């Protein structure tokens, strides 16, 4: 499977694995991971000890379906995940950029979550 990946995906996968060695989420401080494609953005908050997703937001949801993949949409997704975390009384997370550069949409998601009071 790894041989089928193109160069860009291989480099992202290598960065992702390097990052994941040091990032681990707990129930008190779960891991917030970002995935972006050309059409969608999704964010999950994961408790790695239990192996469960605590909250998730995606542009595939009905309320966010009209959003495109751009910085403004990333900020809206970040704010939505922040609201859902506040409902579950989670105010601190570990940010996992998932191998993507901390720029553009990924940064906008982080800034949107920070705007709601989430710390990382």
From Swiss-Prot:
* Entry-linked InterPro entries: Ribosomal_uL18_bac-type (IPR004389), Ribosomal_uL18_bac/euk (IPR005484)
Task: Give one Pfam family, short name only.
Answer: Ribosomal_L18p
Drop me one GO molecular function for this one: 5S rRNA binding
Task: State the Gene3D superfamilies in the record.
Answer: 3.30.420.100
Domain of life the protein comes from: Bacteria
What is one term from the GO cellular component aspect held by the record?
cytosolic large ribosomal subunit
Name its GO BP terms in alphabetical order: translation
Give the residue range of the signal peptide: none
Keyword list, A-Z: Ribonucleoprotein, Ribosomal protein, RNA-binding, rRNA-binding
Q: Which CDD domains match?
A: Ribosomal_L18_L5e
Give the family from UniProt: Belongs to the universal ribosomal protein uL18 family.
Function (record text): This is one of the proteins that bind and probably mediate the attachment of the 5S RNA into the large ribosomal subunit, where it forms part of the central protuberance.
Quaternary structure and partners: Part of the 50S ribosomal subunit; part of the 5S rRNA/L5/L18/L25 subcomplex. Contacts the 5S and 23S rRNAs.
Name-wise, this protein is Large ribosomal subunit protein uL18
């Amino acid at each position: 499977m790894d041989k089928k990946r193109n160069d860009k995906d291989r480099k992202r996968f290598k960065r992702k694995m390097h990052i994941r060695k040091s990032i681990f989420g707990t129930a008190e401080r779960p891991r917030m991971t970002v995935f972006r494609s050309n059409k969608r953005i999704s964010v999950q908050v994961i408790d790695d000890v239990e192996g469960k997703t605590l909250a998730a937001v995606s542009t595939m949801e009905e309320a966010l379906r009209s959003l495109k993949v751009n910085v403004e949409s990333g900020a809206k997704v970040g704010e939505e995940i922040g609201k859902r975390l506040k409902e579950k009384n989670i105010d601190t997370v570990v940010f996992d950029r998932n191998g993507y550069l901390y720029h553009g949409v990924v940064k906008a998601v982080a800034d949107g979550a920070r705007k709601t009071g989430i710390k990382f």
